[in-house]
Amino acid sequence: MDTLRLTLALLALPALLPAAARGAPPVEALYAQHCAVCHGPTRLGGTGPALLPENLQRLRRSAAIDVIAKGRIATQMQGFAGKLSSEEIRALAGYVYTPPAVAPSWTIAEMRASRVVHPPARPDSDRPTFDADPMNLFVVVETGDHHATILDGDRFEPLARFKTRYALHGGPKFSPDGRYVYFGSRDGWVSKYDLYNLRMVSEIRAGINTRNIAVSSDGRFVMVANYLPHSLVALDAVTLEPLKVIEAADAHGKSSRVSAVYDAAPRGSFIAALKDLKEIWEIPYSASAEPVYRGLVHDYRNKEGIAEKGPFPVRVIEVDDYLDDFFFDEAYANVVGAARGAKRGQVVNLNVRRSIESIDLPGLPHLGSGITWQWHGRQVLATPNLKEPIISVIDTKTWKVVKEIRTPGPGFFLRSHENTPYAWTDSFNSPRHDTLTVIDKQSLEIVAELRPAPGKIAAHVEFTADGRYALASIWEMDGAIVVYDATSLKEVKRLPMKKPSGKYNVHNKITRSEGTSH
């Protein structure tokens, strides 16, 4: 844990805790010592999620005790069984299920008051102000010291490095023309950065504990998915002014965290998954989108009934199980998702608006990191697994698993490119976390194992725009970006960086490359 951040959290605790807690009874002191640095001194979240009863609906108290004792796979949550007694662990579990004295909220007025506009030092140019291909830039998120680096993807040289908000989510999003990149932080901040002029433009706090953001394919809107408050927030992509707050609740008023939101460009809509409701939402933003009806109508294609008024109407799709993670097929007609701990994935057709198929997926598939490619004349989807040492390869016509590829250990990411015969994965959640595995996309066999920094975590590969080079991250404070020739698999260059959690190529993201996440 960061000693300075823990000290600041402890200093802030008396002012932030309810009056009854200022005497620091044992459980509050335990929380301050072991939990506040990640989950916030008032349990509102930080690098870790908010720990409040409304955010723990799906977690039984007995399971919470187990998580505190043993940790949680695929997260930074480490177990405390060796540091705390069973009584202390049970006390902490009871504490996080206790409502706070004052219910947390974040209103649209507070959002507007938080907005920051950074004036340019000189007039902005409408063309890149550097000698590099703007479509082959990488945005590298360095979580080690909360910075981002803009990297030239041809020379592999940094063009700029700047401080970011604390605890960025690993997936920044780009405007359709590639000029702007938008960052979302776990504590609710959304930041807009101009890649042409290499400067921060504006920022706004759109929530207290945020999951991720999405940018509409027409470049007009940013949608923010929040764990706290339970909401989606639509922002103007030009100004970052808030346009609408959509409460995440079902028809009976039961609220939910928002697991994730993504842009479905061919549909002109955002798709959001709800953490605590068996629903996904389609939220059209295109003026030509079909009307949205709440309740039953005879035939929505005949425009019968009274449509929900915009902007951002919500079309509710009930599904068979929760979707904690999901992936679009190539046509954006189907969503493939799974609940954490479920033994099967599900396919939801967005046109017929229901679950249509289930898929046998053991362990904990990380479908949000899935990719697709053509295999024997058909398209397959491949997903890593956070719990099992396998890559599941799925036929997207039959929704059957055609092969499970055994890897050195459970992994987090899978990446490829249209111009390479290989897919790359990691073994992040295993003793072999220093190993990258290279898989032939046609034979579905492992062709190489690479250890760019023995003993150190290697993960998250991203390709250059042309697919010639693969960039891997060494996830350590004394980490690096390691550049490989994607054909020979030989190292080309190494750039020292502070825990580079991910790097994102402009071209691959805005063209929705089949080899990267969207």
Go through the PLM ranges and name each one.
Residues V37, T42-T47, L51-A101:
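Extracytoplasmic electron-transfer domains, predominantly the class I c-type cytochrome c fold
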Residues D133-P134, P176-D177, S217-D218, A265-P266, ...:
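Residue-level detector of Asp-centered blade-edge/turn motifs that repeat once per structural unit
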Residues E157-F162, R199-I204, E241-H252, G310-I317, ...:
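A short beta-strand motif characteristic of beta-propeller blades
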Residues A206-K278, V297-V314:
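Asp-box/WD-like beta-propeller blade repeats and closely related beta-sheet repeat scaffolds
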Residues V245-K254, A287-D320, I359-P365, L450-P454, ...:
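Surface-exposed loop and turn segments in beta-propeller and other repeat-based domains
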